[in-house]
């Protein structure tokens, strides 16, 4: 009966007239009446559907589809990153895309408001993961793992204002490398910076600089400048914006929005404009205010040792001690770092690319203990590669240069000039597949040879093997080079070996 409410007025009138007919007419009209009911219901449903406003097909804000062309470039970037992680002995792992909300809250400071909460499903409050670090710490605590070197590639979600033109999204991929365990100071930290340098150099993105600081130095700086301890995290979040905002704007935010005394903000300004190498570390040891703070001295001592290891790794010239680097996430406890691309003169026709940091990380010795019932700590240090921003840079450069990419890795195309040769082509392509050769054919019984050859040229397939009646009689197969258009007949039993030889030489 619930369907009757969907019927328009005319349908009701028609039904009532059928129902009120004399009894002797009801049997003959039963089938017709049932048909009219079904037709009326269907008409009502279709009308309601047609009255809905036009639905715009699009991806949600801050997300995007990746075409086959995009995926080729992305996979090359990820292959380089992952091979570097493996070269340094990391093991791969994964965690759920969503966690208990309680797992993620109070780990990100002011950024906690950017988490995506999921609708309650069966009593558990859940959120999409904001990064890959907190789930890793939860994994270590839950499984009582005390030592691990891992890498993790996966998507994360943040409700921030997306800037698609600069490679910033609400859904994006992160590539993380972390070292967990109790080790001698600064050795794992130095390796993380070495990995950053290897990846950024391998991607050939141009000159880059890795800024380093220490959260103990940041907190010590706040203390000697007169920042109330209750405002440390809030002011740290403001300082973290110096890569996007001018000092006067950051100062305005600290004073007007966060209630910091102007003279305190000015003292901070004297420090955050300092950057340099190991000589700046030595200079800060002599600073009359900073040298009186125990936390800051501990951080400076570790940075001095870190620069010694970086010199041995041959990358000290890529590292800058930068007192403006704060890293707003709450879980950092020691060394922090962030890689930025240096702006170089662009080539003719190129637009300057300003994408912010392309990699970042640091030490978080207390995060695992937040999940352990007894508060047992597992010291950790790690890094995260900003794949989306790197992909944006590579994509823009390819557009400027007019570069095209192959979307498949097909090596050989199986073709025929004659009709009714589908069975022979299927046998031949199966032989190639079984030999590990990447091969394709058209899914038609009688394709034209010109169509097949044109497909190879348009998709970049280097070799064509051609089989026809003449080749079948003579026990040979023709191999055609798509680039030179040269053809040569090869004995059928030697075909696989000849293809493998040609592919190895190309």
Curated annotation (Swiss-Prot):
Alphabetical UniProt keywords: Acetylation, Aminoacyl-tRNA synthetase, ATP-binding, Ligase, Mitochondrion, Nucleotide-binding, Phosphoprotein, Protein biosynthesis, Transit peptide
Enzyme Commission identifier(s): 6.1.1.21
Main location, first listed in the record: mitochondrion
Function summary: Mitochondrial aminoacyl-tRNA synthetase that catalyzes the ATP-dependent ligation of histidine to the 3'-end of its cognate tRNA, via the formation of an aminoacyl-adenylate intermediate (His-AMP).
Catalytic activity from the UniProt record: tRNA(His) + L-histidine + ATP = L-histidyl-tRNA(His) + AMP + diphosphate + H(+)
Annotated family: Belongs to the class-II aminoacyl-tRNA synthetase family.
Protein name stated in the entry: Histidine--tRNA ligase, mitochondrial
Origin species: Pongo abelii
Localization (cell): Mitochondrion
Gene Ontology BP term (one): histidyl-tRNA aminoacylation
């Amino acid at each position: 009966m619930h369907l009757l409410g969907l019927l328009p007025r005319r349908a009701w009138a028609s039904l009532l007239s059928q129902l009120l007919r004399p009894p002797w007419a009801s049997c003959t009209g039963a089938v017709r009446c049932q048909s009219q009911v079904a037709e009326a219901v269907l008409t009502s449903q279709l009308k309601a559907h047609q009255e809905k406003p036009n639905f715009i097909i699009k991806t949600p804000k801050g997300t995007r589809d990746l075409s086959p062309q995009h995926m080729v470039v992305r996979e090359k970037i990820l292959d380089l990153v992952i091979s570097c992680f493996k070269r340094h002995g990391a093991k791969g792992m994964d965690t759920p895309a969503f966690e208990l909300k309680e797992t993620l809250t109070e780990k990100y400071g002011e950024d906690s408001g950017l988490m995506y909460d999921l609708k309650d499903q069966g009593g558990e409050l859940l959120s999409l993961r904001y990064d890959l670090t907190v789930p890793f710490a939860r994994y270590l605590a839950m499984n009582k793992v005390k030592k691990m070197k891992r890498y993790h590639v996966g998507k994360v979600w943040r409700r921030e204002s997306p800037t698609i033109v600069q490679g910033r999204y609400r859904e994006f991929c992160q590539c993380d490398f972390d070292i967990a365990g109790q080790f001698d100071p600064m050795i794992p930290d130095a390796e993380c910076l070495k990995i950053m340098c290897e990846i950024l150099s391998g991607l050939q993105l141009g000159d880059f600089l890795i800024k380093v600081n220490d959260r103990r130095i940041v907190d010590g700086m706040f203390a000697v400048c007169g920042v109330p301890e209750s405002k440390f995290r809030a002011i740290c979040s403001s300082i973290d914006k110096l890569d996007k905002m001018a000092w006067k704007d950051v100062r305005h935010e600290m004073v007007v929005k966060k209630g910091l005394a102007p003279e305190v903000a000015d003292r901070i300004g004297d420090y955050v404009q300092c950057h340099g190498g190991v000589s700046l570390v030595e200079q800060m040891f002599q600073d009359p205010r900073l040298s009186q703070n125990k936390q800051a001295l501990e951080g400076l001592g570790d940075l001095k040792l870190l620069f010694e290891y970086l010199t041995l790794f041959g990358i000290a010239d890529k590292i800058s001690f930068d007192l403006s680097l704060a890293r707003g996430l709450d879980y950092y406890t020691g060394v922090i770092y962030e890689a930025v691309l240096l702006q170089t003169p662009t080539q003719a026709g190129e637009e300057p690319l300003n994408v912010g940091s392309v990699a970042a990380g640091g030490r978080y010795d207390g995060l695992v203990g937040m999940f352990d019932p007894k508060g047992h700590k597992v010291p950790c240090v790690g890094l995260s590669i900003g794949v989306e921003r790197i992909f944006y840079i590579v994509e823009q450069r390819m557009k400027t240069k007019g570069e095209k990419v192959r979307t498949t890795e097909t090596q050989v195309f199986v073709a025929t000039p004659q009709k009714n040769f589908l069975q022979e082509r299927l046998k031949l392509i199966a032989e190639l597949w079984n030999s590990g050769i990447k091969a394709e054919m058209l899914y038609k019984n009688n394709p034209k040879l010109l169509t097949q050859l044109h497909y190879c040229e348009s998709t970049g397939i280097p070799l064509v093997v051609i089989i026809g009646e003449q080749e079948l009689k003579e026990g040979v197969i023709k191999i055609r080079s798509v680039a030179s258009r040269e053809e040569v007949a090869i004995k059928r039993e030697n075909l696989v070996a000849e293809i493998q030889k040609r592919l190895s030489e190309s």
